[in-house]
Amino acid sequence: LKSARVAESPTGRKFFEVVFEKNGATLTQTEWKPDNKNGQLSDEDIQRKEDNQFSRTMQLLLCFYKDEELVFNGTNFEEFAKEVVDYLNKADKSKLLRVKIVYNDKGYTTLPSYAKYTFIEPMILPEGQTSAITELRIDNFTKPVVADVETPVVNPGPSESISISPTVEAAVENNAENPYGLPF
């Protein structure tokens, strides 16, 4: 764990960000405020997103704190995010973590979006305990190939308005200096 902060995007969306670092390489995990995209989601869907986000965040916090040490008094995302960031910035950053990092559908590295399975834990586990992090079928460890999006070419107009004049280039001959007759 390197740092954590609360911020707002240029478009006004609220989020908190957690940065992990190992040997100079960083992973930035952004947790966005769950919102109702143009009224497309039900109240239950929003609540499910909030619960999932809370569970994922608790997995991270429990690497540094005992459950009874974590008290949240916030009533909205902004207050929750501030409390999470405060806890993370006060955490012992020398404590090593074992983190499962996967690719999302756009080819970026991220933490898994699920909360049901373990994806982060302390590197040093209590005596007799083994790692709960496992490779799941839903995990993507191979960077997906994302094809370029082709944009259609706009037709300049009716075909009769385009005049095409064939050009004739000087013929290239096969000779000792150019045995294949190539123009280069």
Regions found by a protein language model. Give the residues of each.
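Short beta-rich binding modules
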Residues: 2-184
